A protein has these predicted regions:
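Short, small-residue-biased leader/transition segments that mark boundaries at the very start
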Residues: 1-3
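C-terminal, flexible cofactor-proximal segment of oxidoreductases
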Residues: 14-130
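A structural motif
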Residues: 5-15
Length: 130
């Protein structure tokens, strides 16, 4: 499931960001993948006369849990590297971990969003028609 580009309580919102997504030094590639994802969602809602779409709280919570689980792979690195901006001066915070990158890397993240689209029914989004 991938609901990282929306947030509960903000209908019809799509977010393009590095937070909770696959970090890559080739930023245009990340934008391209996120654009494909957004275009798929928008095409679906237009084709199905959806008036509003919004991520469910349960789906958002599940995605944040995924981010936190995968962040553990990076936590040792953040705690042991030279203090600086990216590790809160050597003290990684829960907020920083939650708002970090998808811990499986960009290739895995792009596959996750492709697999989500392949399901075809926008799981985790509440769709209101009319």
């Amino acid at each position: 499931m991938c609901i990282r580009d929306s947030t509960s309580g903000f209908p019809n919102l799509l977010i393009f960001s590095l937070q909770q997504s696959g970090f890559t030094v080739n930023f245009p590639h990340a934008l391209d993948e996120q654009s494909k994802h957004a275009a798929y969602i928008l095409r679906h809602v237009l084709d199905h006369d959806v008036r509003t779409f919004e991520v469910t709280q349960a789906a958002e919570d599940a995605w944040v849990e995924t981010i936190l689980e995968l962040a553990q792979f990076n936590l040792d690195f953040l705690e042991s590297c030279t203090p600086g901006y990216y590790n809160n001066e050597g003290k990684p915070s829960a907020r920083g971990v939650r708002n970090g990158f998808y811990g499986g890397g960009s290739v895995q993240f792009f596959q996750v969003i492709a697999d989500w689209r392949a399901k075809g029914d926008l799981p985790g989004l509440e769709l209101l028609t009319g």
